[in-house]
């Protein structure tokens, strides 16, 4: 790989490098940076009419003639008898593209109009649906009102029946109370409840959970074996002692069997 020229010169000055390579010659290429394709020299030489110019077409490499005022072109010179003026291909393409865009826009506009008309047709349908929903809502509200009225009527009937029952009970109590006030004395002494009688303070039922006894409670029973034990005591902690004698038990059993046979 060759050394750069500046480095070779520096090394040659120091005496390190004695042979200098010749500097390569740079190739110079002339280019035309003018984008104007109009050939003014050919236009002047051919003596073209005013506003006509000879132009070079870079796409095909052929010249054509261009009128700058009308923006029309021709492949032949205006002095040629077969001279025909037309629009440029680029302009024709642009016009066609514009026409296509315009037609597309028109089609889109037509489609939008159709969609708008469809929506306008759908709008009455929605209005009908809304009216149907309103009718259904009114029907439901009417049914709820009817149900509410029926419930109120049922409550009124129940209230009236309760009032009638209370009035009947009150009248019945009033008649019973009046009958008791009019009676000079109770009809039957047995009708008086035993609960109305005063309890004997010595009765176990007055100070304990023992049941209230009768006039025969605690008296010796017939054909009962005399054990000498307290028969009123009950519960798991009480045991009847002393035990009766075997003879007393046999006599009691015999007496009970005779009584059963007589019955």
Swiss-Prot record:
Sequence repeat positions: 104-110, 111-117, 118-124, 125-131, 132-138, 139-140, 141-142, 143-144, 150-151, 152-153, 154-155, 156-157, 158-159, 160-161
GO MF assignments: double-stranded DNA binding; ribonucleoprotein complex binding
Spans annotated as 3 X 2 AA tandem repeats of [DE]-R: 139-144
Phosphoserine sites (modified residues): 245
Gene Ontology biological process terms, A to Z: activation of innate immune response; alternative mRNA splicing, via spliceosome; cellular response to exogenous dsRNA; defense response to virus; innate immune response; neuron projection development; positive regulation of defense response to virus by host; positive regulation of type I interferon production
Tissue-specific expression: Detected in brain cortex and hippocampus neurons (at protein level). Expressed in brain with high level in cerebellar cortex, hippocampus and olfactory bulb.
Cysteine-cysteine disulfides: none
Occurrences of domain WW (ranges): 46-80
Quaternary organization: Interacts with POU3F2/Brn-2, ATXN1, TXNL4A, HTT and AR. Interaction with ATXN1 correlates positively with the length of the polyglutamine tract. Interacts with RNA polymerase II large subunit in a phosphorylation-dependent manner. Forms a ternary complex with ATXN1 mutant and phosphorylated RNA polymerase II. Interacts (via C-terminus) with TXNL4A and CD2BP2. Interacts (via WW domain) with ATN1 and SF3B1, and may interact with additional splice factors. Interacts (via WW domain) with WBP11; Leading to reduce interaction between PQBP1 and TXNL4A. Interacts with CAPRIN1. Interacts with DDX1.
Chain positions covered by the region annotation Important for interaction with TXNL4A: 243-253
Task of the protein: Intrinsically disordered protein that acts as a scaffold, and which is involved in different processes, such as pre-mRNA splicing, transcription regulation, innate immunity and neuron development. Interacts with splicing-related factors via the intrinsically disordered region and regulates alternative splicing of target pre-mRNA species. May suppress the ability of POU3F2 to transactivate the DRD1 gene in a POU3F2 dependent manner. Can activate transcription directly or via association with the transcription machinery. May be involved in ATXN1 mutant-induced cell death.
Chain residue ranges for the region called Disordered: 94-263
Entries under Gene3D superfamilies matching the protein: 2.20.70.10, Glutaredoxin
Protein name: Polyglutamine-binding protein 1
Cellular compartment(s): Nucleus; Nucleus speckle; Cytoplasmic granule
Residue span of region 6 X 2 AA tandem repeats of [DE]-R: 150-161
5 X 7 AA approximate tandem repeats of D-R-[NS]-H-E-K-S: annotated segments: 104-138
Species of provenance: Mus musculus (Mouse)
First and last residue of the signal peptide: none
Keyword field: Immunity, Innate immunity, mRNA processing, mRNA splicing, Nucleus, Phosphoprotein, Repeat, Transcription, Transcription regulation
Recorded domain comment: The WW domain may play a role as a transcriptional activator directly or via association with the transcription machinery. The WW domain mediates interaction with WBP11, ATN1, SF3B1 and the C-terminal domain of the RNA polymerase II large subunit.
Biased composition (Basic and acidic residues): 99-173
This protein's GO CC annotations: ciliary basal body; cytoplasm; cytoplasmic stress granule; cytosol; neuronal ribonucleoprotein granule; nuclear speck; nucleus
């Amino acid at each position: 790989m060759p050394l750069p020229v500046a480095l070779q010169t520096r090394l040659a000055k120091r005496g390190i490098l004695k042979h200098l390579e010749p500097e390569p010659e740079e190739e110079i290429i002339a280019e035309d940076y003018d984008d104007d394709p109009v050939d003014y020299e050919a236009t002047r030489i051919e003596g073209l009419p005013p506003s006509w110019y000879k132009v070079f077409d870079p796409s095909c490499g052929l010249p054509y003639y261009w009128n700058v005022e009308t923006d029309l072109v021709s492949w032949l010179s205006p002095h040629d008898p077969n001279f025909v003026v037309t629009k440029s291909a680029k302009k024709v393409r642009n016009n066609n593209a514009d026409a296509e865009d315009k037609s597309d826009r028109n089609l889109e506009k037509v489609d939008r109009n159709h969609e708008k008309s469809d929506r306008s047709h759908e709008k009455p349908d929605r209005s009908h649906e809304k009216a149907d929903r309103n009718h259904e809502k009114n029907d439901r509200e009417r049914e709820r009102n009817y149900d509410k009225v029926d419930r109120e009527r049922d409550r009124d009937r129940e209230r009236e029946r309760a009032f009638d029952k209370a009035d009947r009970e009150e009248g019945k109590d009033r008649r019973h109370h009046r009958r008791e006030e009019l009676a000079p004395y109770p009809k039957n002494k047995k009708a008086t409840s035993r609960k109305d009688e005063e309890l004997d303070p010595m009765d176990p039922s007055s100070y304990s959970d023992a049941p209230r006894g009768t006039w025969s409670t605690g008296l010796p029973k017939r054909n009962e074996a005399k054990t000498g034990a307290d028969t009123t005591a009950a519960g798991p902690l009480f045991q009847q002692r002393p035990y009766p004698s075997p003879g007393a038990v046999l006599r009691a059993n015999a007496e009970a069997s005779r009584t059963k046979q007589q019955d």
